[in-house]
Regions:
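Acidic/polar, glycine-rich intrinsically disordered N-terminal extensions of enzymes
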Residues: 1-151, 158-165, 190-193, 434-441, ...
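Gly/Pro-rich turn-and-neighbor structural signature
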Residues: 2-58, 183, 223, 261-285, ...
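Secondary-structure transition/capping motifs at alpha-helix termini
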Residues: 109-115, 160-169, 189-200, 234-244, ...
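Active-site cavity-forming subdomains of large catalytic enzyme subunits
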Residues: 110, 114, 119, 123, ...
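Short beta-alpha connecting loops at secondary-structure transitions
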Residues: 138-141, 210-220, 253-257, 296-305, ...
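Phosphate/diphosphate-binding loops
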Residues: 148, 177, 192, 216-236, ...
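Mobile "lid/hinge" segments at catalytic clefts and subdomain interfaces of large enzymes
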Residues: 207-209, 225-283, 357-436
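Short glycine/threonine-rich loop-to-helix capping motif typified by GTGT followed
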Residues: 257-265, 300-312, 341-356, 385-395, ...
Length: 580
């Protein structure tokens, strides 16, 4: 737009503010407007082709791909086409012992959830403890499945054979610090089934930096932890081209309290650190970039910001890969992630059915940002019942309504060119680049984390948010507002029994202890001990990739705790960041 037009708009805007707007404010006795109106003045220097472009083309602001298949769900509803989505068996889940989870997956397969598993592990497993260690007491099988040895993987994967075997379905492992141990188990299990590991597909989370910053299931100090991540990246690039070694995660930092811009910046800074590991190990960035995935940044109820931050993150990532790493393959410029996942911490135990409304808002933001309109988590998440079949059905149906009835996925990047959205996207991007610059000045993600920079920034942001809730400045319906005696407290109920019997969960710990004791009694313990010694020797040599020696230990049924303890003797343990 030329300068004369901008000058005219500026003059007309001033006249509007002084006359039309002021009359409206006076009527309602307001000093300033609670709303904003955007014009070309807010995007004076905006270059559409440079900043937005077209879907599936650099800088990917308008979308990762030139088209999506989500609208085809309408054809599936009419029986014209198969469902393009394959639902993971049980979604994200894991219960009790391997037998319990196997049976649960089979039950869910009977309901049409035929994809591979997205395995939730219990806390002892995530933190490197065997089920028979003192630190594991009371936690075995509680928030996920207990997996101590290859024997547990063998049992769990009895639910995935035939046309669902390891080379025909993908597995996700929500595991971080000990991720290489579980990759080793997956590889050895494939070997035992006669399946070449280059046919395996799946994704371990394996993002140790965000664990140290936000979640806490760390084991080793940062530098040896990054060495383990390097080993994952290199091994997968060389041997398992269909398997993604890392899912770089912003979600958990957002849950910990990071703002949208902080979450974007910290995630990208962590991504830079991980990509640099591969490059420093001698890999061509275009060889492994396509195997690196992202777990969404997480979404708040700030609808417009959540759309803007997704547009900005695609642009930021594309710039990092093209300009910083010199990637030549356009596939390397694409940020691979599932979409906008509504933050579980935004759900409330009070009036839980309101959470479905909140999740629908998140689904709409996801659709308008160019992804599937995932209506998640289920409304009963804060009640500890996020697995209820009623809640899952409502979430699934809400997504179907958004796609099939509302047509939310019919248009790619519907806000493209909007004065408001483009200015907001630019603002979020600029804030993120400022933080990334600060992290670079500190030496990169690892030194910045070691200095406490991430922790302090997230703590400050979390405090500001919580203070807003407690003062009432941040309104949360049914929690700090609209609580009068005339408000109806709507209760929820479960009508369908869950396939996993809670009684089994209560008995899981003893059964798992019995399973582990049996394995340790029947295996060749002398061979296990020797393999653990070889693992320690390998760990002392920085140049050695530890996945092959871990596979050797796994074949002999060494336990996770034994392998972790052997590595602790060489690496030590992470003590955690101190005061803020």
């Amino acid at each position: 737009m030329d300068k004369d037009n901008l000058a005219e708009i500026e003059a007309r805007k001033k006249n509007w503010e002084e006359s039309t707007l002021q009359k409206s404010l006076a009527r309602y006795r307001l000093q300033q407007s609670p709303t904003r109106f955007y014009t070309p003045l807010d995007t004076r220097d905006h270059d559409f082709l440079e900043k937005v472009g077209f879907p599936g083309e650099y800088p990917y602001t308008a979308g990762t791909y030139p088209s999506t298949v989500y609208p085809l769900m309408r054809l599936r509803a009419r029986g014209i086409a198969d469902d393009m989505r394959v639902r993971r068996a049980g979604s994200y889940s894991g219960y009790g012992t391997a037998e319990d989870s196997r049976d649960f997956y089979r039950a869910m397969q009977g309901r049409g959830w035929t994809g591979g598993p997205n395995i939730a592990f219990d806390l002892p497993t995530q933190c490197g403890y065997d089920s028979d260690e003192p630190m594991a007491v009371g936690e075995v099988g509680r928030v996920g499945v207990a997996v101590d040895t290859l024997r547990d993987f063998e049992v769990l994967y009895e639910a995935f054979t035939g046309d669902r075997d390891l080379d025909k379905t993908a597995s996700n492992f929500t595991i971080n610090a000990p991720a290489n141990i579980y990759l080793a188990m997956y590889f050895v299990l494939a070997e035992k089934r006669g399946i070449s590991i280059d046919k395996l597909a799946g994704t371990p989370q394996n993002d140790i930096l965000k664990e140290i910053v936000a979640r806490g299931t760390y084991i080793f100090p940062i530098k040896p932890s990054m060495r383990m991540t390097r080993d994952s990246i290199v091994f997968c690039a060389e041997h398992t081209p269909q398997l993604n070694p890392v899912s770089i995660s912003g979600y958990h930092m957002r849950e910990a309290g990071a703002s949208a811009a902080q979450s974007l910046a910290f995630t990208m800074a962590n991504a830079i650190a991980y990509f640099q590991l591969g490059v420093d190990a001698g890999l061509d960035v275009d060889k492994f970039a396509g195997q690196m995935t992202f777990l969404t940044l997480g979404g708040s109820m700030d609808f417009y910001t959540e759309i803007a931050v997704r547009r900005a993150e695609r642009r930021v990532f594309a710039r990092i890969m093209k300009e910083r790493f010199g990637a030549k393959n356009p596939r390397s410029w694409i940020q691979r992630q599932p979409g906008v996942l509504f933050l579980a911490s935004t759900t409330t135990a009070q009036r839980p059915l309101n959470n479905l409304t909140r999740a629908v808002v998140g689904g709409m933001a996801s659709a308008m940002a160019g992804y599937a309109p995932s209506v998640s988590p289920p409304y009963d998440e804060p009640l500890g019942l996020g697995w209820s079949l009623e809640a899952q059905q409502l979430s699934e149906d809400a997504m179907r309504v958004l796609i099939c009835e509302a047509g939310m996925t019919d248009v790619l990047d519907p806000f493209a060119g909007s004065y408001f959205m483009e200015s907001l996207t630019d603002k979020v991007e600029a804030e993120a680049w400022d933080i990334i610059k600060k992290i670079d000045e500190l030496g990169g993600a690892v030194p910045a984390i070691e200095s406490g920079f991430y922790h302090r920034e997230i703590a400050r942001s979390a405090y500001e948010f919580q203070r807003g809730v407690e003062t009432g400045e941040k309104v949360i319906v049914g929690v700090n507002a609209f609580l009068g005696e005339n408000e109806l407290e709507v209760e929820t109920s479960r009508l369908v029994a869950h396939p996993y019997d809670p009684k089994k969960r209560d008995e899981a710990e003893q059964r798992q202890l019995d399973n582990l004791a049996k394995v340790k009694k029947e295996r060749d313990n002398a061979a296990v001990k020797a393999s653990l010694e070889r693992l320690k020797e390998a760990a002392k040599d920085e140049s050695v990739n530890l996945i092959p020696p871990l596979m050797e230990c796994v074949r002999l049924y060494a336990s996770e705790g034994e392998m972790v303890n052997a590595l602790k003797e060489v690496f030590g343990e992470y003590e955690g960041y101190g005061s803020l």
